[in-house]
Amino acid sequence: MPQARTIKHVFVTGGVASSLGKGLTASSLGELLTSRGLRVTMQKLDPYLNVDPGTMNPFQHGEVFVTEDGAETDLDIGHYERFLDRDLTRNANVTTGQVYSAVIAKERRGEYLGDTVQVIPHITDQIKARIRVMAEPDEDGRTPDVVITEVGGTVGDIESLPFLEACRQVRHDVGRDNCFFLHVSLVPYLAPSGELKTKPTQHSVAALRNIGIQPDALVCRADRELPEDLKRKIALMCDVDSDGVVACPDAPSIYDIPRVLHSEGLDAYLVRRLGLPFRDVDWSVWGDLLDRVHKPSERVRIALVGKYVDLPDAYLSVTEALRAGGFAHRAKVEIAWVPSDTCETESGAAHALSGMDGVLIPGGFGVRGIEGKLGAIRYARTHGIPTLGLCLGLQCMVIETARALAGLERANSTEFEEPCQHPVISTMADQHDVISGDRDMGGTMRLGSYPAKLVPGSVVAEAYGETEVAERHRHRYEVNNSYRDRLSKAGLVFSGTSPDGRLVEFVELPRDQHPFFVGTQAHPELKSRPTRPHPLFAAFVNAALEYRAAERLPVDISDSVQESTASV
């Protein structure tokens, strides 16, 4: 009888400072192990008390990444999906809010049989249960070889302690030979002395050891290469094998990180330590990606007109989907961050958008900056600039075309104006109690993957290459069906709807009116992969490239025109 395969656990922690790139490090390691033929899944443990990031300010948290099954998760889950090239579920993100809610609910039901409910063992047991779920077979019945779990926050944070203790207990439960602790730390460079300093990393590792965790390997983040003697010093002072000290200086692209970690031998070291099957990394797919990243044959400039552009992480999946769309055409996408407020006037929109090859209107919430988004759409529509609207972007496209083409000057959304003379965008039927405050706001939007039917021959159908698609959603408002006929007569094409025809999913202008003017109620950026660009983004970038090429074409001026010009 064959011996049951043991699932390996890799825990990724961070020290010294936040925003070191733990998520990208973990994702890159996952990509390397996947390229070695291993089945990898990933999880993020977030120490904040929010149940999920769905109600958090984008300026504080960045984007909310929505999974296929409708979970609102941390943006690192997006990194995991893009690097692993696989869909994850709601189990991939665990927060303190979820853990405490579950434990308190059990206590109220009497499941603890009168025990005093404590952080240890009740909270830690709940965290361990969430970690164990990741080791179970997926919907296809396949069990992972490796579960990579990233612990959010920084070692030393009070709120991280229960999660770190749970990880320590998992090592005890499954055996030390089946666990690997990877610690990401900062090695700062002090310009006055001209030195890289190891003391912060030593203190960070000491803090980990104080709670019973000895890291097996260290990823040392720095703005420059680490000398070998410095790596040997870190290995000695932190009690880590020399092969386990990995230098990870800043890379030109996030997609270079797997190559950097591989060149330092991290994946080979981990495979040996965990006794995993040793196969060479297959670079065929990722190598082709890096070739497209670093050797573009063309460039294209896209304006991203948003409300949260001061924090680019608020649009992380959008920017990566745009870049991936460029990779599909061996083009480098240069993103111009345009605050939507600057486009409220015609002159402001012209100043911000002239010279752009494409305009993207991303999602968002609230009335601030909406007139600027409408101004940007108006400029792009009237100047024939390829335009893509996502979620709120579609709604703004509908409002703008209703005002400009259908003669509904007071057209608006009930999100921004209530009551509204022409509510071309209205609250979804099952969302009225949320808007009125009678139901919780968190986790109640239309979330997750939903199917759509596309009109054959439409721009979106040709982009997808099919007429039945499914995309992820996150919204409370929709196109008001009572205005669909009037908008259609004005020239707006409803090129995709829900299978029952009730919900508008895609709109566009005909090709004879505009080269590419497409909006979707969905968030297609969430399904884009660097190695498999989303077809809608690939089509948008292609339209931008064609627009750029047309702008550069020489213009023939007839002799009569030249003569009349000369005589003026």
Curated annotation (Swiss-Prot):
Chain residue ranges for the region called Amidoligase domain: 1-276
Activity regulation text: Allosterically activated by GTP, when glutamine is the substrate; GTP has no effect on the reaction when ammonia is the substrate. The allosteric effector GTP functions by stabilizing the protein conformation that binds the tetrahedral intermediate(s) formed during glutamine hydrolysis. Inhibited by the product CTP, via allosteric rather than competitive inhibition.
Cellular component GO terms, alphabetical: cytosol
Active site: 391, 523, 525
Catalytic activity: UTP + L-glutamine + ATP + H2O = CTP + L-glutamate + ADP + phosphate + 2 H(+); L-glutamine + H2O = L-glutamate + NH4(+); UTP + NH4(+) + ATP = CTP + ADP + phosphate + 2 H(+)
GO terms for MF: ATP binding; CTP synthase activity; glutaminase activity; identical protein binding; metal ion binding
Binding site for UTP: 18, 197-202, 233
GO biological process annotation, one example: pyrimidine nucleobase biosynthetic process
Residues reported in the UniProt entry to bind L-glutamine: 364, 392-395, 415, 476
InterPro entries: Class_I_gatase-like, CTP_synthase, CTP_synthase_N, GATASE, GATase1_CTP_Synthase, P-loop_NTPase
CDD domains: CTPS_N (cd03113), GATase1_CTP_Synthase (cd01746)
Domain annotation Glutamine amidotransferase type-1: ranges: 301-550
EC number: 6.3.4.2
Annotated metabolic or biological route of this protein: Pyrimidine metabolism; CTP biosynthesis via de novo pathway; CTP from UDP: step 2/2
Binding site for CTP: 18, 157-159, 197-202, 233
PROSITE patterns: GATASE_TYPE_1
Miscellaneous notes: CTPSs have evolved a hybrid strategy for distinguishing between UTP and CTP. The overlapping regions of the product feedback inhibitory and substrate sites recognize a common feature in both compounds, the triphosphate moiety. To differentiate isosteric substrate and product pyrimidine rings, an additional pocket far from the expected kinase/ligase catalytic site, specifically recognizes the cytosine and ribose portions of the product inhibitor.
Family matches, as PANTHER family: CTP SYNTHASE, CTP SYNTHASE-RELATED
Description of how the protein assembles with itself and partners: Homotetramer.
HAMAP family from the UniProt entry: PyrG (MF_01227)
Function: Catalyzes the ATP-dependent amination of UTP to CTP with either L-glutamine or ammonia as the source of nitrogen. Regulates intracellular CTP levels through interactions with the four ribonucleotide triphosphates.
Family to which this protein belongs: Belongs to the CTP synthase family.
NCBIfam families named among the record's database cross-references: PRK05380.1, PyrG
Designated name of the protein: CTP synthase
Organism: Saccharopolyspora erythraea (strain ATCC 11635 / DSM 40517 / JCM 4748 / NBRC 13426 / NCIMB 8594 / NRRL 2338)
Organism lineage: Bacteria, Bacillati, Actinomycetota, Actinomycetes, Pseudonocardiales
